[in-house]
Amino acid sequence: MPVITLPDGSQRSFDKPVSVYEVAASIGPGLAKATLGGRVNGQRVDAHDLISEDANLVIFTPKDDDGLEIIRHSCAHLLGHAIKQLYPDVKMAIGPTIDNGFYYDVDLEHKLTDEDIAALEARMLELAKTEYDVVKKKVSWQEAHAVFAARGESYKLEILERDIPQSDQPGLYHHEEYIDMCRGPHVPNMRFCLNFKLMRVSGAYWRGDSNNKMLQRIYGTAFADAKQLKAYLNLLEEAAKRDHRKLAKKFDLFHLQDEAPGMVFWHPKGWTLWQQIEQYMRAKQNDWGYQEVRTPLIMDRVLWEKSGHWENYRENMFTTESEKRDFAVKPMNCPGHVQIFNHGLRSHKDLPLRLAEFGSCHRNEASGALHGIMRVRGFVQDDAHIFCTEDQVVAEVAAFNQMLKSVYDDFGFTDIAVKLSLRPEKYAGSLETWNKAEEGLRTALRAAGLEWEELPGEGAFYGPKIEYQIKDALGRSWQCGTIQLDYVLPERLDAEYVADDNVRKRPVMLHRAILGSFERFLGILIEHYEGSFPVWLSPVQVVVANITDSQAEYVKRVEKALREQGIRVIADLRNEKIGFKIREHTIQRVPYLLVVGDKEVENQSLAVRTRDGKDLGVMPLDAFIAHLTADIARRGRVFSAE
C-alpha cells in the first residue's frame, strides 16, 4: 500500500490507494479545503486522482504557481460552460492557459461585442457561485468520440482524430451539463474560480493556419483572490498609460504605418534617443575588447543552407531573386560573423576573438504578432560573437556577466533574473562536452555573484544558454540579454583555428546580446521611465526660456555655451507667457528648464527648475554645467537634485 513522501521529507502510509485530497485531509482540514491538485512523482494530477504506489507528492493550493495555473485553466472551462448556455450553437476549439490568464477559441457566427462579453462574464460568475463539483472521467477514445459527435463538436473531434492515439484514454471534465476534454488537472469545485475578468476578443485562425477558418478568441485573466485580481487590473491600467505607442506620439519619438508593417519611422527625438544608446554600447563594447564589424544585409541561399537557416527558418526569412540566384535578407548576424572569422587562417593566439555588430536584421513575423516597436519585422541587435577555445569559455562568460550587469545598472535596471537552460533530450556533441559547458556556465554565474534558475531540457540542441530578464517599474519581466554556447555552427560553416600543437580545431562560438533588439529595448525604456528618461538619454536635456524679448540675446549665448559642452539644448524664444513655456516643457519631460529674466541677465545667472517642479535656485552657468555633468554621469542611477 502506498507510502507518500512530502516535500519536507515526512512520510505518510495508507492501507489503500489514496487521492491527493485524502492525503491533504490527513494533514489537516485547512489544507484539504485548499487542495486543487498535486504533483505525483513529477506528474501533475487532479485532487481526486488515486495514488496506488509509493510516491513523492507535492500538494497544490491557490498560493502556488501550479495552483494558480489550475484555476486559470478551469476558468477557461467555465467560459466554455457559460458560452454554451448563452449560444448553444457555438463550437468549442481549444482553451489553454497563457501568461497571466487563459483564452478560449470558439466558432460562433455572431460577432461578440463588449456587451456580449460583459453578459458572458456575468453568466460565468453566476455559474461559479453555485459551487458545483467538477467531475473527471477517463474514457476510451471511442467513447470520447461518441460524446463529441453527439454534441456536434467538430473541433474536438478533429483533435481526437489527429492528435490523440486511439489507445489513449482522454479525460472528460463534466461541468454539470457541459463537457470538455483536457489533460488537466482542474479544480475539484468551482468555488475556486470566482476571481476572473474577461479582457478582450480577437481573431485567431484554427491551428494558427491562415488557410483555416478564423475563430473568435476570448481572453481572460484569473487569480486566487479578489485582491490579486484588482492589483493585476490596476497594473494593466497603469501599463496602458505607459504604452510606448501612446508615449511615442506624445513625445514625438517615432511612428509606424501600414505601408511598412513592422518597420519604424524614427523622428528626430526618437533617433537622438537611439543614437545615445548605440554610442553608449559602442564605447562599452570597445572597453571590453570587442571589435566592431559590418556584414551584408542580403546573402546567397547557399550560405543559409550551410548554416541550417534555410531548412529551419525559411518561413521567417524575406527572400528575393537576382540573376537566377536566390538570396535572403539576414534574420540574424551569426553566419556573417563566421565568414569574417574564416577570412584568413586563425591561430590560437588570436583567440578569444570578439566580433560585435549593430546588425540590421529582418524577420517575416506574422502581421497579427506585430506590436508597436516591441515586435517588429525590421530591427537592430547589439549582436556579438565570441570565438574561443573550450578552456576560455568560463572566463569569457564571466566577463560578459560583469559587462551585462554594468550596462543594466546604467540604464536603471538592477533586478535581474537569470535562467540557465540545460541539455535537451536531443543534442549535438558529446555528453562530456555538454557537462563541461554547463558547469562552466555555472562557474561563470557564481563569479559574477548572480543567482539563477536552472531549466533542464530547455537548451538549444547545439548548446546550453543563459537568459537574463530585467524587471521594469511595473514589475514586469523582459528577457533581453542572452549568451549561448554553440558547437554546431562552427562545424557547419567550417570555422577552425590552429591550436598550440599545430592541429586544426573548431572554435567554440558564443552568441551574446545585452539589449537584444534595439527597438524592443527602447520600447521597454519608454514604458519604464514613462518618457522621463535619465538626463544622459533624454533627447532634449535642457530648455532655456526667456520671459521677455529683452533676454533673448543672453538666452542665445547660454544655449551656445551649453551646446559647446555637448549638451542637447533648445532655446525657447517664443512670444508666450513663461508659465505656458514651463508647463509645456514639463509635460514633454525635459529634465531641466532654465528661466531667464532681467535679474538673471544682470547677474549673468540662471533660474534652474527640474521637470519634477523642484526649484534649484539661481546659479551661474558654470555651476549649472557642473551640476548637469554630474547628473549625466549618474546615468540610470537615482538622482538627487541637491
UniProtKB/Swiss-Prot annotation:
SMART domains: tRNA_SAD. The keyword Protease does not apply. It comes from Cellvibrio japonicus (strain Ueda107). This is Threonine--tRNA ligase. Zn(2+) binds at residues 334, 385, 511. One of its GO terms (cellular component) is cytosol. It is an enzyme of class 6 (ligase). InterPro entries: aa-tRNA-synt_IIb (IPR002314), aa-tRNA-synth_II (IPR006195), aa-tRNA-synth_II/BPL/LPL (IPR045864), Anticodon-bd (IPR004154), Anticodon-bd_dom_sf (IPR036621), Beta-grasp_dom_sf (IPR012675), TGS (IPR004095), TGS-like (IPR012676). Keywords: Aminoacyl-tRNA synthetase, ATP-binding, Cytoplasm, Ligase, Metal-binding, Nucleotide-binding, Protein biosynthesis, RNA-binding, tRNA-binding, Zinc.
